[in-house]
C-alpha cells in the first residue's frame, strides 16, 4: 500500500532524527521487508504470525509520529520479526508450474492491457474430487453391484433346506430372487445350490 509506505518512511525519518546508524538499520530492514513480492493468496495460507496488539502498536506509533528512541527500537524489533517471518514463508513456498491454460490467460491479459474491452478468460476446469482409497473387496462388490448379472428362472436351495424358485439376479455376493412379484435378497453364504 503506497500510503502506508509513505507514512512509514516519513515516520522512520522523524523517529531516528540525527542518529544515522539507527536510521540506516531501520531503512535496511524496512526496504528488505517491503520489497518482498508475495501474493495475498500465499499469506491467506501462511499468515504472518504478528499479534494484533503488536501490529496496532506499530501503526499507532507510525501515525502518531512518536520521536522517542523507545518506540523506534520497538518498531525496529517488529519490522525484524516481520522480515524473519517473510524469509521463513518464502523459503517454504513451493513453486507450482503454470499449465497451458494459465499461460494463455496471462498472454490474453497482457495483450488486453490498456484496452477498455473486458478480458475473456478460459473456463476453469472443474475441481476433481480426491480419489478415495478402498479395499479390493469393496471395489469388487461395488463394481458387481453396478452391473447385475441376470440368471433367469432358477431354483435355489438354501443351507437350511428351503427351496425357492423364481427369476434370479446376482449383485456381487448377493442374489435377488423375484417370486410371485416379491423380491427377496439372499446372501451367497446362505445358498447350498442353484439349479436350472
Swiss-Prot record:
The protein's name in its UniProt record: Uncharacterized protein in sph 3'region
Residue ranges, annotated region (Disordered): 122-150
Sequence ranges of Basic and acidic residues compositional bias: 122-135
Amino acid at each position: 500500500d503506497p500510503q502506508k509506505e509513505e507514512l512509514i518512511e516519513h515516520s522512520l525519518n522523524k523517529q531516528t532524527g540525527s542518529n544515522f546508524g539507527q536510521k540506516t538499520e531501520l531503512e535496511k530492514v524496512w526496504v528488505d521487508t517491503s520489497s518482498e513480492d508475495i501474493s495475498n493468496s500465499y499469506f491467506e495460507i501462511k499468515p504472518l504470525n504478528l499479534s494484533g496488539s503488536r501490529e496496532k502498536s506499530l501503526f499507532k506509533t507510525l501515525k502518531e509520529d512518536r520521536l522517542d528512541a523507545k518506540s523506534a527500537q520497538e518498531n525496529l524489533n517488529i519490522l525484524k520479526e516481520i522480515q524473519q517471518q517473510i524469509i521463513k514463508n518464502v523459503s517454504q513456498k513451493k513453486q507450482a508450474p503454470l499449465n497451458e491454460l494459465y499461460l494463455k490467460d496471462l498472454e490474453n491479459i497482457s495483450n488486453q492491457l490498456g484496452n477498455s474491452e473486458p478480458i475473456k478468460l478460459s473456463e476453469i476446469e472443474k475441481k476433481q474430487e480426491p480419489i478415495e482409497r478402498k479395499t479390493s473387496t469393496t471395489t469388487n462388490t461395488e463394481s458387481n453391484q453396478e452391473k447385475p448379472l441376470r440368471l433367469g428362472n432358477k431354483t435355489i436351495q438354501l443351507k437350511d433346506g428351503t427351496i425357492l424358485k423364481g427369476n434370479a439376479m446376482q449383485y456381487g455376493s448377493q442374489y435377488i430372487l423375484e417370486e410371485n412379484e416379491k423380491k427377496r435378497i439372499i446372501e451367497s453364504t446362505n445358498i447350498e445350490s442353484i439349479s436350472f
